[in-house]
Amino acid sequence: MTSAESLLFTSLGPSPSSGDGDCRFNEEFKFILLPMSYAVVFVLGLALNAPTLWLFLFRLRPWDATATYMFHLALSDTLYVLSLPTLVYYYAARNHWPFGTGLCKFVRFLFYWNLYCSVLFLTCISVHRYLGICHPLRAIRWGRPRFASLLCLGVWLVVAGCLVPNLFFVTTNANGTTILCHDTTLPEEFDHYVYFSSAVMVLLFGLPFLITLVCYGLMARRLYRPLPGAGQSSSRLRSLRTIAVVLTVFAVCFVPFHITRTIYYQARLLQADCHVLNIVNVVYKVTRPLASANSCLDPVLYLFTGDKYRNQLQQLCRGSKPKPRTAASSLALVTLHEESISRWADTHQDSTFSAYEGDRL
């Protein structure tokens, strides 16, 4: 057994082999795949999210509810990508972590903090869209920017609170001259970590994903009704774009990662056949960069669904100055919402899409 193989086996946890208890992994692919993947996510994520934060802070105020959710989504993505250089070094150095236990805990914590904050912020956007399309009067009440800000603060705190045990599970472990930064925990604590991780997954991924699917199913049923008017067609197109982008992020980033991670954890707990466990391990490691890629895909949501964001981004790329805000444009959101209430009261049905017209980035 080579030293590299011994190191990889030590990091596994409970011995998965049903024979002599020695199941060695050949993870050479990981030392190429993960550094390259995380480096790409770092460059693209920072290049896409840093200008987004600047636009939200200096060119897109005042925010409506959707802009509030998207700002916090971009902030979460930016914080995460800033931690990726340490992981690039760690995997390029073949599982050697020289940065101390505290930073190991923080980087692993930040991965899941970003992951589940992103899930919940996308769920907030989905519910907000659903209310604007299917229940416009409730959208006026619950879609206020102040309520959205409080909800975002709650998301940050709830996710952080749920992940506090992760700070105790994750640790470093010396193996000769190499120091491991566990992405789970020590072998003797692995079964407890799986129970904790499964509970967090159900609460912060399973339930929000179910809510998102229900909202978009109800939205799709309403959106495919025939509607007159160009403005309503524009609103419908924007909503369909939102559905497409959010479901793509879930399908590409979140769902594969959680499925393969669950299979991998259970295979280790049940001490599956070594050959099976090797295959599961490879598939799981491949989906980890996909989970990080949501930091690059989220900006597509702002670009496809936000007219104001798209216009300001074009001005920023051209180096032109923003146009001065007029009183009429400052009051546009209020006027359009008031108009939507009037239309809804008159028709009780088809103008529900207009209630969302003012909610443009």
UniProtKB/Swiss-Prot annotation:
Glycosylation sites: 175
Organism in which the protein naturally occurs: Rattus norvegicus
UniProt note on tissues of expression: Widely expressed at low levels. In brain, higher expression in the pineal gland and ventricular system.
Gene Ontology biological-process annotations: cellular response to prostaglandin E stimulus; G protein-coupled receptor signaling pathway; regulation of presynaptic cytosolic calcium ion concentration; regulation of synaptic vesicle exocytosis; transepithelial chloride transport
Superkingdom as given in the UniProt entry: Eukaryota
Regions crossing the membrane: 31-58, 69-91, 109-127, 150-170, 193-218, 243-265, 284-305
Keywords assigned by UniProt, alphabetized: Cell membrane, Disulfide bond, G-protein coupled receptor, Glycoprotein, Membrane, Phosphoprotein, Receptor, Transducer, Transmembrane, Transmembrane helix
Predominant location category: membrane
Region called Disordered, residue ranges: 1-20
Family: Belongs to the G-protein coupled receptor 1 family.
Pfam family, one: 7tm_1
Membrane-topology descriptor: Multi-pass membrane protein
Main function: Receptor for ATP and UTP coupled to G-proteins that activate a phosphatidylinositol-calcium second messenger system. Not activated by ADP or UDP.
Any one cellular-component term (Gene Ontology): presynaptic active zone membrane
Extracellular side: 1-30, 92-108, 171-192, 266-283
GO MF, any single term: G protein-coupled UTP receptor activity
Disulfide bonds: 104-181
Residues in the Cytoplasmic compartment per record: 59-68, 128-149, 219-242, 306-361
Subcellular location: Cell membrane
InterPro entries in the cross-refs: GPCR_Rhodpsn, GPCR_Rhodpsn_7TM, P2Y4
Name recorded for this polypeptide: P2Y purinoceptor 4
Signal peptide positions (record): none
PTM note: Phosphorylation of Ser-329 and Ser-330 is a key step in agonist-dependent desensitization and loss of surface P2RY4. This phosphorylation does not involve PKC, nor other calcium-activated kinases.
